[in-house]
Amino acid sequence: YSLATQYPNIRITVLSKPFAKAFFEDLASNVSFMEADIKKEYSNIKGLNALYRRLVAKNFTAIADFHSILRSHYLRIRFNIDRYKVAHINKHRAGKRRLISNNNKVLIQQPTSFRNYADVLAKLGYPVNLDFTSLFIDKYGRTTVQLPEAIGTKNSLQQWIGIAPF
């Protein structure tokens, strides 16, 4: 959201699994969503090559890998070979391992996920201010948007858990 509002003249395409489309549909006018069914259509090397061709056809000027998993590593290699501007997230795994180590624990604050995402964007030439607080509450604490109707109403017997998948 911060990228979309701070750089309104760039076109942003989010690539993710189909379930995530609802999170990005009405986010900002310069944000679009592209589905990738990695369980079926893009589940192997042949599929990843097809996905790569589909992505190249979009003529992106920069690629931000916020996931950094085996599939995205492969796609990153392909984009790097073709000289696209590519940046990927640093998950700071070594620091996290030291933080939870049984011996010689090193208690150093690790960067937040938001900071890691912002670092990826900065590497691509789009530094963002991390002053975002909510899509649903303005800077004065007033509710600006009701939760989407797709969520429905919680009944007294249900337990809801909020998860941020990105």
Predicted regions and their residues:
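Catalytic machinery of carbohydrate-active enzymes
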Residues: 1-166
